[in-house]
Amino acid sequence: MLMADRCLLYYITDRSQFRGDEPARRRALLAKIAEAASVGVDYIQLREKDLSARELEMLAGDALAAVRKSTPLRTEDRELRTRLLINSRTDVALAAGADGVHLRSDDIAPHEVRHVLEASAHRPSATDHFLVAASCHTAADAFRAESEKADFAVFAPVFGKRGLAGTPPAGLAALREACRAKIRVLALGGVTAENASLCLEAGAAGIAAIRLFQENKIEDVARALRAL
């Protein structure tokens, strides 16, 4: 178990939840990303799986601009600002200059991403650590993520997936087992401001969510979670 000094916050995007046409949803998403960055959310995962690689790269560029505009930190404080990760697409993350990639359980292994970095024309400089997060659904997945050099893991679904019948919750006991891994494990899946403390008590280093951040004022969510 590797605990954080404070509850880590991981906002996962889904622009389909916003109202309006595509331009309106895109504007709403970028506004929410800026809001998250302005209150110090640690990580944002751009998870817009319907977009082509080119469309995702363009959106990632706009998202990075929103993050950087909303966090007026000095260059040497880069590690303290919100970090933008791209869902699944290491190639897009590198091309866009994102801070990392979030790997699904059926993606390449974290250590393989390091090989991709070595071969990429867009590889980060020696001073920029490219983050690799890994999805996990069992304790074995979390230990595998540790052995394959992921920076952190996201365990799901702790309390199930809202609106998806037939997706049973993994439960707090399973989360507790996953948190025995020597990397940070964040909790995802049905987590609310009311039950988040149970995840932290089970050993989670932080909370990952879509609706918790998108449907509420992020400043209020961040304050509540970091008070736990």
Question: Model regions: which residues?
Answer:
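Conserved cofactor-binding/catalytic machinery of classical short-chain dehydrogenase/reductase
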Residues: 174
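EAL-family c-di-GMP phosphodiesterase catalytic domain
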Residues: 163-164
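Conserved N-terminal beta1-alpha1 strand-loop-helix module at the mouth
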Residues: 1-72, 77-118, 128-152, 167, ...
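C-terminal binding/interaction regions
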Residues: 207
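Flexible, gly/ser-rich surface segments that form the specificity/activation loops bordering the active-site cleft
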Residues: 156
